[in-house]
């Protein structure tokens, strides 16, 4: 098994647990990252990004796949639709990953999961997506805003279309993690130096002095300040 195939298979298993079995994404992803913490940072980052991205963009990904497949996503075998979703995400949103590599690894995954007969189908759909991705457009609100239609309809009835769309758009904004400094264990300076040394992005220009906003970390338990109890996860609103 190649290194790339390995990490993609990990993503496949995570997504099957979440999308097909209904398990909580943050728990399954966290368990996987802990299990495979021996992998290099960039591999764990890949696992995290493809998992979270596929889940976040599922509505749009399904719409794209349906455009290029005679078999609708809902009628596909769970393994096949999951391989297509995670691969379509890479093709559409990860420019540094060659489309040819995505297609080849998807075919390998299909064959490894004993779907040799559908490997050609997987390859065909993905190569069509790759070829036509520059001309794709999304006009349906649920595809554009990545929100189920019934939720948008409910918000529109309550607040009007413009406000409903603004609410949906707010969910597309990447949110850093808010943490509270345990001042009895470490000073603000110590925490900032520790986070900076590990390459995390830190925002400290808002909120109480003991609350920070962090991002660009791979695995929270490997953040020194967190593992030592210097910081704990806390919503900004609860610290006011």
Task: For every predicted segment, state its role.
Residues 227-240:
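Conserved SAM-binding loop and adjacent beta-strand
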Residues 1-225:
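Class I Rossmann-like S-adenosyl-L-methionine
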């Amino acid at each position: 098994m190649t290194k790339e195939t390995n990490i993609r298979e990990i993503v496949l298993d995570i997504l099957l647990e979440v999308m097909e079995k209904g398990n909580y994404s943050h728990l399954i992803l966290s368990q996987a990252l802990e299990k495979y913490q021996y992998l290099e940072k960039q591999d764990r980052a890949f696992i995290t990004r493809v998992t979270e991205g596929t889940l976040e963009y599922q509505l749009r990904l399904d719409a794209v796949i349906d455009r290029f497949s005679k078999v609708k996503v809902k009628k596909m075998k769970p393994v096949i639709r999951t391989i297509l979703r995670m691969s379509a995400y890479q093709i559409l949103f990860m420019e540094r990953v060659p489309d040819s590599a995505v297609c080849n690894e998807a075919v390998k995954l299909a064959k490894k999961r004993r779907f040799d007969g559908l490997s050609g189908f997987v390859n065909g759909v993905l190569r069509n997506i790759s070829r036509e991705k520059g001309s794709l457009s999304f006009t349906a609100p649920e595809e554009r805003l990545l929100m189920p239609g019934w939720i948008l309809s409910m918000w529109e009835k309550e607040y009007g279309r413009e406000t409903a769309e603004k609410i949906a758009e707010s969910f597309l904004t990447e949110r850093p993690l808010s943490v509270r400094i345990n001042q009895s264990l470490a000073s603000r300076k110590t925490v900032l130096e520790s986070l900076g040394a590990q390459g995390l992005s830190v925002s400290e220009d808002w909120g109480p002095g003991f609350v920070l906003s962090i991002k660009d970390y791979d695995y929270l338990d490997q953040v020194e300040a967190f593992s030592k109890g210097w910081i704990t996860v806390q919503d900004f609103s609860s610290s006011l």
